[in-house]
């Protein structure tokens, strides 16, 4: 049965939760059926992977920033910035996930007759009880891909062809021994109400820059030039020898670009200082 609509709430007392949802009908008829999940706390880490139905190859870890405002305040967004690798994704965490999560996921889908080929995004939470899976996505993460793929040494087309052909085990997936940070430039007011159609200046600064990238999202080409056309407008990514240098470079590059209602968080990568 398809679930067409979902609503959620966090409740300390389970009886109060049942009464609020099923008796008081806080969510109307949507509350006739409930799914009760464990409430978890910890750092969230994103791990992308390639899968060919049997073999899974893990990419570098990344850490996203979902809230719209500095200090993780405001509404949830599609992601306001990210960095890779995550210093909290340790060798111990990696070994646990490889043993209990990654290959087990691929094997379980194959056993159900749902052999999967493509990208699996693992949304993990590092709890006191160990890594837990929060979500799966059958796609690259945005903006996670903007800090993971620039560090990948392999040809992306060759890797994707190996996923299709079932020869991923022959691919030696390699990543640069450095770091990358992405800062999203958004339209002020995102993710609620915002204006668009403003001319974007400074994009030419990225031409010929090996360690700097400008990824387009909410943009549109017009006769006057490229203008804003969405909430998240651009992803500004920079690489560095370590996370602190990459963060410094990324924020420097955000100053190359301007448009009338430009907005960004100023604390992307704040967890780097806590590692």
Model-assigned labels for residue ranges:
Residues 1-11:
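Single conserved hydrophobic/aromatic residue that forms the stacking wall/gate
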Residues 12-46, 103-112:
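Conserved ATP-binding module of the ATP-grasp superfamily
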Residues 16-21, 37, 44-73, 122-123, ...:
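Beta-strand scaffold of nucleotide-dependent catalytic cores
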Residues 49, 56-101, 137-151:
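ATP-dependent carboxylate/phosphate-activation module, predominantly the ATP-grasp catalytic core
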Residues 51-55, 126-130, 222-223, 239:
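Short acidic-glycine loop/turn motifs at beta-strand connectors
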Residues 98-120, 137-211, 221:
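Active-site "cap" helix and flanking loop/linker of ATP-utilizing ligase/carboxylase catalytic domains
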Residues 219-223, 227-275:
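Generic C-terminus detector
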């Amino acid at each position: 049965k398809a679930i067409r609509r979902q609503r959620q709430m966090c409740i300390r007392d389970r009886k109060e939760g049942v009464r609020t949802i099923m008796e008081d009908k806080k969510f109307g008829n949507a509350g006739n059926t409930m799914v009760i999940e464990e409430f978890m706390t910890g750092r969230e880490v994103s791990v992308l992977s390639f899968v060919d139905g049997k073999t899974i190859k893990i990419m570098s870890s990344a850490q996203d920033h979902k809230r719209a405002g500095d200090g993780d305040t405001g509404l949830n967004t599609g992601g306001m910035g990210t960095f890779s690798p995550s210093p909290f994704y340790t060798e111990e965490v990696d070994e646990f996930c490889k043993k209990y999560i990654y290959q087990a996921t691929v094997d379980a889908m194959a056993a159900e007759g749902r052999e999967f080929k493509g990208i699996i995004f693992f949304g993990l939470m590092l709890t006191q009880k160990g890594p837990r899976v929060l979500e799966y996505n059958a796609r690259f993460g945005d903006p996670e891909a903007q800090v993971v793929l620039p560090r990948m040494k392999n040809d992306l087309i060759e890797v994707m062809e190996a996923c299709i052909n079932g020869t991923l085990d022959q691919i030696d997936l390699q990543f640069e021994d450095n770091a990358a940070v992405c800062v999203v430039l958004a339209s002020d007011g995102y993710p609620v109400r915002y204006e668009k159609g403003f001319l974007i200046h400074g994009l030419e600064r990225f031409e010929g820059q090996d360690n700097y990238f400008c990824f387009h999202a909410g943009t549109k080409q017009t006769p006057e030039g490229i203008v804003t056309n969405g909430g998240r407008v651009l992803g500004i990514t920079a690489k560095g020898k370590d996370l602190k240098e990459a963060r410094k470079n990324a924020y420097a590059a955000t100053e190359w670009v301007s448009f009338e209602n430009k907005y960004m968080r100023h604390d992307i990568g704040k967890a780097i200082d806590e590692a």
